[in-house]
Amino acid sequence: MTAISIIENRSNEVQLPQWLQECLIDQESLESDSDALLICQAFNFAYQLHEGQTRKSGEPYIAHPIAVASLLRSLGGDSVTIAAGFLHDVVEDTDVTPEEIEERFGVQVRLLVEGVTKLSKFNFSSTTERQAENFRRMFLAMATDIRVIVVKLADRLHNMRTLEHLKPE
């Protein structure tokens, strides 16, 4: 499937930002631009893995990773950070392992995706206990790579922007 037909197929489902459309159209000529190639490959992988999944709003799930990656790009994120934005839910929501992420996208992307996944995993009985653990994990993630926190914040920001689709609890 050519990059242009990929865009045509996907545009029926979700609006692709201009920067991503340009990346996909130029995909064949990206061999010399490893940063753009990494971003396009991460998008394609996330798209395949999230195909058929929907958000509570009913929109295709891939709209969320696109929004997260777009936020990261607007903040000046590097290609590794933007790729992690596309892939941040892949380990949590599919059968893909961190090892497969590393094999396909490198150790830096794996570490960011794993860091974001670990920030989401714990459940606690008390609010105080939960808040203390959240701060502890956030500080540990910042000590390792601040980009983990930036990806997680972009994820949360997009989730907050789409809260109207959740049931009030």
What label would you give each PLM region?
Residues 1-169:
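Active-site helical microenvironments for divalent-metal-assisted chemistry
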